[in-house]
Amino acid sequence: DEALERTIQSWAQKGIKSTFVDKGGHTWSLERYVRTVLKSTLGNTYDKLRKDRMSEYDVHTVLVTSHMGARKACSKIQGHVADLRESVSSNEKYKSIYDPYWGAEYGTAGGHRGINCNHLHIPFIPGINTNNQPKIDAKENEKVAELTKRQRQLERQVVKFKKNQMVSEALDHT
């Protein structure tokens, strides 16, 4: 009975394993993988539709939304207007979103608009639109990002303990 209970506890902790292993060597649970894929796919689909419509009207500039606690790859570009074209002439008012100046790693999983990035690209027409995004202090942003990361770790621990409690109660070991 003890071996069975240990096995059930172990399975409950690990969840349903996927074969996905990230660059850090962490194996993702199926639940985490599905949640991440659905969130990213929905955001990317909406973003692509918006940008397709923008290109129909020859609009290439976007206002990048800003929020406290943004990842490092997003911290410099957020709250600024950027040009979506890969290369723009040096006399253009707005830098390309791909410009190394931003350090945004745009188009990569861990970069700006990558996995779990919540930034939006709002169509921006120079001379018509205004930048209404709040400017965020880089040091404060980094501090909040670290605190948010720690909060997520604590939330995962709470979920783990609740799973243990549910399994124990189901096995009548409260």
List each language-model region with its residue ranges:
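Domain-core detector
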Residues: 1-112, 125-174
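Catalytic core of tubulin tyrosine ligase-like
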Residues: 119
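Long, His/Glu/Asp-enriched segments that create or flank divalent metal/ion-associated functional microenvironments
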Residues: 115
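An acidic, gly/pro-interrupted, aromatic-rich
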Residues: 122
